[in-house]
C-alpha cells in the first residue's frame, strides 16, 4: 500500500467531492446536506481547492481523505476533515489531524455536528474540548453543532481508569 499526503490540485476536485459527499451521506446522515451534489462539486472545484489549505490522503492513487484548513485572526481552523467510510479507523484521520496541527497556530478550532458522535469521540480523544454548543441556527444545515478547540499542548487526553 502506497500512502501519500499532498496538496489538493484541481485535478482532484471530483475525487475530493466524492469523499465529502459519501462521508456526509453515509456517516453524517443526521445532518442532511444543504446543497445538491452538483452544487457541492462546483464548490469544491471553484472555491475549496483554489482557496488553498486542502490536503488529500491518497492510497495507491485513490483519494480517500481530505483536510481543509484556514487561518483566522486569533486561531487556526479545521474547516473539513473527511474520509471515505471504509478508511475510518485506519489512522488516516489522526495523520490528517497532525498535518493540521503542524500547519496551524494554536488554538485550533473546528465545528462538528452534535449528532456526529463518532467524530466527536475522535476529536475528544485527540485533545479537543467542546467550548460551545449551538442550536444550529448559524450553519447551513440548521443542525445543532458544537465548537471544539484544541487542548493546550500540556494537556493530554484522559484515559479510562
What are these regions, as identified by a protein language model?
Residues 17, 21-45:
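Conserved GNAT-fold acetyl-CoA-binding loop/helix
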Residues 83, 89-102, 121-125:
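Conserved acetyl-CoA-binding loop-helix of GNAT-fold acetyltransferases
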Residues 103-114:
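Conserved GNAT acetyl-CoA-binding A-motif
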Amino acid at each position: 500500500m502506497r500512502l501519500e499526503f499532498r496538496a489538493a490540485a484541481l485535478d482532484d476536485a471530483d475525487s475530493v467531492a466524492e469523499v465529502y459527499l459519501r462521508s456526509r451521506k453515509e456517516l453524517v446522515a443526521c445532518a442532511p446536506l444543504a446543497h445538491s451534489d452538483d452544487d457541492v462539486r462546483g464548490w469544491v472545484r471553484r472555491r475549496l481547492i483554489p482557496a488553498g489549505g486542502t490536503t488529500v490522503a491518497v492510497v495507491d492513487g485513490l483519494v480517500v481523505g481530505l483536510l481543509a484548513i484556514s487561518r483566522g485572526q486569533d486561531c487556526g481552523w479545521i474547516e473539513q476533515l473527511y474520509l471515505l467510510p471504509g478508511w475510518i479507523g485506519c489512522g488516516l484521520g489522526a495523520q490528517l489531524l497532525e498535518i493540521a496541527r503542524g500547519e496551524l497556530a494554536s488554538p485550533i478550532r473546528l465545528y462538528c455536528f452534535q449528532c456526529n458522535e463518532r467524530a466527536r469521540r475522535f476529536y475528544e480523544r485527540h485533545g479537543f474540548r467542546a467550548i460551545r454548543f449551538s442550536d444550529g441556527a448559524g450553519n447551513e444545515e440548521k443542525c445543532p453543532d458544537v465548537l471544539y478547540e484544541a487542548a493546550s499542548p500540556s494537556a493530554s487526553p484522559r484515559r479510562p481508569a
